[in-house]
Amino acid sequence: MFYLCTTLYFKQFTFMSTELFSTLPYKVADITLADFGRKEIDLAEKEMPGLMALREKYGESKPLKGARIMGSLHMTIQTAVLIETLVALGAEVRWCSCNIYSTQDHAAAAIAASGVAVFAWKGETLADYWWCTLQALNFEGGKGPTVIVDDGGDATMMIHVGYEAENNAAVLDKEVHAEDEIELNAILKKVLAEDKERWHRVAAEVRGVSEETTTGVHRLYQMQEEGKLLFPAFNVNDSVTKSKFDNLYGCRESLADGIKRATDVMIAGKVVVVCGYGDVGKGCSHSMRSYGARVLVTEVDPICALQAAMEGFEVVTMEDACKEGNIFVTTTGNIDIIRIDHMEQMKDQAIVCNIGHFDNEIQVDALKHYPGIKRVNIKPQVDRYYFPDGHSIILLADGRLVNLGCATGHPSFVMSNSFTNQTLAQIELFNKKYDINVYRLPKHLDEEVARLHLEKIGVKLTKLTPEQAAYIGVSVDGPYKADHYRY
């Protein structure tokens, strides 16, 4: 009865006015999807043994009691399990998505109905997106978070840019061309007009941030090098049980899921161009080859290029590949990987997509403003662009994450690895005082995350004898590898 009453109570608030600092308990697409979301969350919990083990281990001691956790991370079913783990460990949580297309509306509804403040829906505008981020950063009484779960670094960036603007408002008037930066500056101007010290107060209370993805980690290291980082950070992305699993095995399954749901195209026999051969690129390349595609790889790093070649992939430049490919996938985390001059030369109905965090790997803006271009929307997140010469390309998810924009992202099991790391990082940051720097979780915790997932898939681990451990200079219980070991 309580659950039904809660659902009815919440429903009346959906899609009300969007004042700068809202008093809404949540904002989602459709709260009536909560029951559907709850059923899928129940299924996902069985596939996420790491998170469930942390609930069992820390449920009574509640190491996050008193923590105000703000999350900016794809609002999916798997993320719902993470959120409810943080709550079970004692935290007060507010959440938004880190991508305008990645929210699963039934997951957001289920979390909202459970009493967590979530501001996310699939198909947000960029203005909506930054408004949602602001709401997630705004706890009761105008307080900010004590710890942050970030994916891509946008929550961290909002605080840092806002902080800088309070010192020098002119930073918000600098010329920017990316629409997301334009909208960020616009909302920060409104915040500054209302409260000229907000971000200084918020930053002072943040004990740290744990960052999920490569792009966000790059931002953190850059701020640290420039002396601008305002609080400690954990680089979760480079934990072995994240980068070598989520990035590799997750993409190996979710890329094909996104492409097929969007286009129903036959991959076998196609030429697929994978831009980048890091962990994400490796997963994507092997995925496409497993479907029977001929895979071409582009790379700037000679080591990664050699790895690709030794795996049997043809390593070429985009200048050559753009004329040959049927499907293009960017995986680099860099800008301008597929330029408009490449798209001009592509085959008719070439499929172009991205599985890196931001849409700037593909020159989407240049495509939209190309003289004489004609856009035809096929269905949500699938657009066909006709060039004046008659050929067309199909852009998926508007150049944003194809696996989350056109499908539901990585499977639950592999996300349990990543989110177990996130939870451990949150416990560390909240309970210990770190100097301002960028850190990684220690090796023994990385191994523990892996260990928590072995039983689920039937793994039986061999145990070292004391003599064997002494011979190679490790403890019987680990860690088993040096920090520099590359796996």
From Swiss-Prot:
Its EC number is 3.13.2.1. The keyword Hydrolase applies. Its main location: cytoplasm. It is found in: Cytoplasm. It catalyses: S-adenosyl-L-homocysteine + H2O = L-homocysteine + adenosine. NAD(+) binds at residues 213-215, 247, 276-281, 299, 334, 355-357, 403. Its cofactor is NAD(+). One of its GO terms (biological process) is S-adenosylmethionine cycle. It comes from the Bacteria. Keywords: Cytoplasm, Hydrolase, NAD, One-carbon metabolism. The keyword Membrane does not apply. InterPro entries: Adenosylhomocyst_ase-like_sf, Adenosylhomocysteinase-like, Ado_hCys_hydrolase_NAD-bd, NAD(P)-bd_dom_sf, S-Ado-L-homoCys_hydrolase_CS. Belongs to the adenosylhomocysteinase family. PANTHER family: ADENOSYLHOMOCYSTEINASE. This is Adenosylhomocysteinase. It comes from Bacteroides fragilis (strain YCH46). The lineage of its organism: Bacteria, Pseudomonadati, Bacteroidota, Bacteroidia, Bacteroidales.
